[in-house]
Amino acid sequence: MGLYKTKSKRSIANYHHIIIINIFILSSITSSSMASSSSPSSIDFSTAILIRVDQSGKGDFSKIQEAIESIPPNLNNSQLYFIWVKPGIYREKVVIPAEKPYITLSGTQASNTFLIWSDGEDILESPTLTIFASDFVCRFLTIQNKFGTAGRAVALRVAADKAAFYGCVITSYQDTLLDDNGNHYFKNCYIEGATDFICGSASSLYERCHLHSLSPNNGSITAQMRTSATEKSGFTFLGCKLTGSGSTFLGRPWGAYSRVVFAYSFFSNVVAPQGWNQWGDSTKENTVYYGEYKCYGPGADREQRVEWSKQLSDEEATVFLSKDFIGGKDWLRPAPSHFKNAPKQTQNKEIN
């Protein structure tokens, strides 16, 4: 999404969230059929229909998109679906359509379950994984766009409300994560890129995430798009870790009222002393909301920070320090603890 180009050698950091999916999946499956239609308030969030994806042919499907296509439209929000992706490298472009909410896509470990594609230039068409459905959850999966340094190459686009990501690795170079619109939550994720690698107009909370910059000189971690002072969108980074090579800004404004806050986060010396960039438009210095609160590390020194960024007071920071920022208490849900087999018409006919 950025205007400047960088040419450093791309490398994927040796960082993985080694979190093994609960083995109770195998022992909790029942043979119950799909529940009848019901209102959202009557969903049993403890139980999901389980669909297995396994390249070896031992699952219900061998490709992730096939598993998604097997799920019927679910606009009455009556059923949770849990797609369990066995370890492997899945080379495909995946889309979750709007008419299929309440899907969880889960790898086994982010270190051995990969969704990879290579596409670039078009920010809306290049994503390896695109989410259009609400109430989506992704766990323990590595999502990569391997297009390289030549232009925009989105690994993940989130264009729906109420999406959560846990223990995921998301990597590309430019525009890695298009955090497009809606309320979103990212926890214990690793996100890597060089230019505007977290961008978009969503309202998102990033908690205990590791952000790694590949930019050799003056890249930007964020490019948040907020077009008015009354718009509720913005990015909050809470308890995060910023590392990398070269130098990077914390953010620059895609929209005139761009809003980004870093709190309780570690900044390595990869963060440029100025901290923030106005993207060649000094008028935005009067309208953006760029704040830091109790951050630490060599890159957190504010002595040379641009004067139009904020060192937030306790009172100013409060609104950004909890899940209330994204209304998360109303929609974030725990992982299901019980599973049902998919109906026969949903399963791959080749599987006995």
UniProtKB/Swiss-Prot annotation:
Glycans are attached at N76, N218. Residues 343-352 have a biased composition (Polar residues). The chain crosses the membrane at residues 13-35. The record marks Q174 as: Transition state stabilizer. One of its GO terms (biological process) is pectin catabolic process. It comes from the Eukaryota. Pfam families: Pectinesterase (PF01095). GO terms for molecular function: pectinesterase activity. It is an enzyme of class 3 (hydrolase). The active site is at D175, D196. Its main location: membrane. It catalyses: [(1->4)-alpha-D-galacturonosyl methyl ester](n) + n H2O = [(1->4)-alpha-D-galacturonosyl](n) + n methanol + n H(+). Residues 332-352 are annotated as: Disordered. It is found in: Membrane. Its EC number is 3.1.1.11. The keyword Glycoprotein applies. Pathway: Glycan metabolism; pectin degradation; 2-dehydro-3-deoxy-D-gluconate from pectin: step 1/5. One of its GO terms (cellular component) is membrane. Substrate binds at R252, W254. Acts in the modification of cell walls via demethylesterification of cell wall pectin. This is Putative pectinesterase 11.
